[in-house]
Amino acid sequence: MTTTLTLIRPDDWHLHVRDGAALAAVVPHTARQFARAIIMPNLRPPVTTAAQAVAYRERIAAAVPAGVDFTPLMTLYLTDNTPADEIVRAQAAGVVALKLYPAGATTNSDAGVTDVRKTYAALEAMQRAGMPLLVHGEVTDPAVDVFDREAVFIDQVMRPLRRDFPELKVVFEHITTQEAADYVAEADAHTAATITAHHLLYNRNAIFTGGLRPHYYCLPVLKREVHRLALVKAATSGSSKFFLGTDSAPHPAHLKEHAAACAGCYTALSAIELYAQAFDDAGALDKLEGFASLHGPDFYGLPRNSGTLTLRREPWQLPETLAFGDAQLKPLCGGETLDWRLLA
């Protein structure tokens, strides 16, 4: 039995860090494990310009503990009105991607895209620049069942998008279904996907076991076991199309434990340990380094990291709560025991 595991230092290709005091509370958790992270732009107001992204990057950098090497990779929030020349400014400022949120699909997405065709000028500029598009892949039509919105998105949005922009790099973010895993596996080399730790570890029963458990509520929502197994198969396949993206999404505990609970699981505290658990459960620890450390930078055209981190098979208990500005934050699996621990 493997007792220690050393990996090239991984990156997180999908992360929420919020802003202000909340940002200061969570950035150190990610920086301890990951060399880089793609930062989501869904603040209030959203990060829609290169200048806003640069300012946000500076605020994140200021929260990184002294002596820790961590680089935030910035994104812009795509809207119906994003001009093509903003893509040029963004690339010049070091912004690495744009994020497409269908309007109303998730947290702070009300300023998102109402019709993908309205973004075609920006997408053409991105295709020319080689800048990836990161997609929250759910339709928002209220007539479509919440558990079917990802599968419907593939036919209604992804296929036409890929047809019209065949050279555009597209990341299908936080996939949750067998349909999405199959779609990405069968697509060309310009299409990839991120997968979260919680979608690898849990199916939708986790939300309801022993009562309603809001800290397991996220968007896209957890799905049936058949879909979880398909995600595990994809993540552990060794395919370079699939890579790590936590979608760690912190919310104050009182807004999670609420009549209208916020969507999002906070996994950044123990992200790499959770992924190690999922890969260990699948008997595929040998595939974790590719998924966590290699496939993402290769797709983005960035250098692989040179440092390493080491995990040890050592049971440890996650804290139940964390400080989060003036509030508390409850990590996923808080108070529970994990089998793998990151060595300091």
UniProtKB/Swiss-Prot annotation:
GO terms for biological process: 'de novo' pyrimidine nucleobase biosynthetic process; 'de novo' UMP biosynthetic process. Its cofactor is Zn(2+). One of its GO terms (cellular component) is cytosol. The keyword Zinc applies. Keywords: Hydrolase, Metal-binding, Pyrimidine biosynthesis, Zinc. CDD domains: DHOase. Pfam families: Amidohydro_1. Zn(2+) 1 binds at H14, H16, K99, D247. Disulfide bonds: none annotated. PROSITE patterns: DIHYDROOROTASE_1, DIHYDROOROTASE_2. Pathway: Pyrimidine metabolism; UMP biosynthesis via de novo pathway; (S)-dihydroorotate from bicarbonate: step 3/3. Its EC number is 3.5.2.3. SUPFAM superfamilies: Metallo-dependent hydrolases. Homodimer. Belongs to the metallo-dependent hydrolases superfamily. DHOase family. Class II DHOase subfamily. This is Dihydroorotase.
